[in-house]
A protein has these predicted regions:
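N-terminal leader/linker segments that precede catalytic domains of diphosphate-processing enzymes
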Residues: 1-165, 172-186, 194-237, 251, ...
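Short aromatic/basic micro-patch
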Residues: 248
Length: 301
């Protein structure tokens, strides 16, 4: 990727890039085309299961009841982790759960944020359960102090999801036992080589909720957005091999890329949140995009 030259964030090029209303990610964020049945734990709908996969759950009727209105987990709280370990391993063998990662993720109640069980990360999309993500817009100021450049990463071609697509400087899922902030600090080093003192400068944006069909099932995710200004001389360097390259893009070029399928849906929405909060898009287009993005934002836990 090519580093920027100084770009005025009020330049005509930025305004032109900001005229687009057809942001791919805004349409994709809630696209639901496959029929799914609610997945209920302790009386709360915590996810959903694709109706074509309901028959695969029949062998575990002792713990998982497939009812007309919902799939209900009847296993006790003490049994759940072991039940999920057994069931998910078999579903993985059958090819219904893909991209196994050996990362424990919490099964969260969307209403309360409480943890109802712990299972393998890759299983969340089969069950359509809520996951949390932490993403960070890395930005650099121009001579006037306004955002002139955004650090944009390209995902490794070997990534399990969205290989080779453009991404935010930092982004990742929040595993069991970590908060979004703690996950962000960890990912800051793994993905960009930034230490905790540098990451401490990050400031929060909004929380964006996706609930959409994906090849693995259903992505039901709350993205916690952060911004981090990188100072002159601070150069991100990937540490974990999950980033193919990273570069500093003029804001107008980052905006144009984020509006297309070249960038992941998650990263596109996180980038748009940054552009809107910092008033970098031309009105009245900004107002129309803000109205659409605001519908995706949540104050839920």
């Amino acid at each position: 990727m090519t580093d920027r030259t100084a770009v005025d964030p009020a330049s005509p090029r930025l305004l032109a890039a900001g005229q687009r209303l057809d942001w791919h990610a805004l349409t994709e964020a809630r696209k639901q085309q496959r029929p799914r049945r609610a997945f209920v734990v302790d009386g709360d709908a915590v996810g959903s299961v694709d109706e074509v996969h309901l028959s695969a759950l029949q062998p575990w009727g002792r713990w998982i009841e497939v009812r007309a209105e919902a799939v209900v987990l009847t296993a006790s709280a003490a049994e759940r982790d072991a039940v999920f370990a057994e069931v998910n391993a078999r579903l993985h063998e059958q090819g219904l759960i893909r991209a196994w990662r050996d990362e424990p993720f919490p099964l969260l109640c969307p209403r309360t944020g409480q943890v109802r069980a712990v299972f393998e990360r890759a299983c969340a999309r089969f069950w359509g359960t809520l996951t949390l993500g932490a993403h960070c817009n890395g930005w650099q100021a121009g001579p006037d102090g306004q955002a002139a450049g955004l650090w944009i990463a390209r995902r490794s071609a070997t990534k399990a999801t969205d290989p080779g697509k453009l991404d935010n400087l930092i982004g990742g899922g929040v595993p069991f036992g970590q908060t979004p902030w703690e996950a962000l600090v960890r990912e800051g080093f793994e993905e960009a080589g930034l230490n905790p003192d540098q990451m401490a400068r990050a400031t929060p944006g909004r929380v964006i909720e996706l609930n959409r069909d994906v090849p693995e099932g259903r992505q039901f995710e709350r993205l916690h957005v952060f911004d981090l200004q990188l100072l002159e001389g601070e150069q991100p360097v990937n540490q974990d091999g999950e980033v193919a390259e990273v570069g500093l893009w003029p804001v107008d070029q980052a905006c144009a890329a984020a509006a297309t399928e070249e960038m992941t849906v998650d990263a596109s929405l996180v980038t748009l949140d940054f552009l809107l909060r910092r008033q970098l898009l031309a009105p009245p287009t900004a107002a129309a995009l803000e109205e659409r993005l605001a519908r995706l934002c949540t104050a839920a836990p």
